[in-house]
Regions:
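Extended, alpha-helix-rich binding/interface surfaces that flank or overlap catalytic cores
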Residues: 1
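The conserved cystathionine-beta-synthase
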Residues: 4-20
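Short, charge-rich, low-complexity interaction segments located
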Residues: 24-52
Length: 52
């Protein structure tokens, strides 16, 4: 998990990383957390959920 301040500074690099590795990156915010993943991986998850 990386802090939101680091994610802001490295956003393009993180976008490139999740697209290349297909591994999501957890981001720690102030009180809330989030996950960054590629659009292709998100679409795949949505398709899987639809089929269930």
């Amino acid at each position: 998990m990386i802090p939101v301040s680091e994610a802001q500074q490295k956003l393009q690099d993180l976008i490139d990383a999740v697209n290349q590795s297909h591994q999501p990156i957890a981001i720690a915010g102030q009180g809330n957390n989030a996950v960054l993943l590629s659009e292709a991986d998100w679409a795949s998850i949505q398709e899987t959920l639809y089929l269930l």
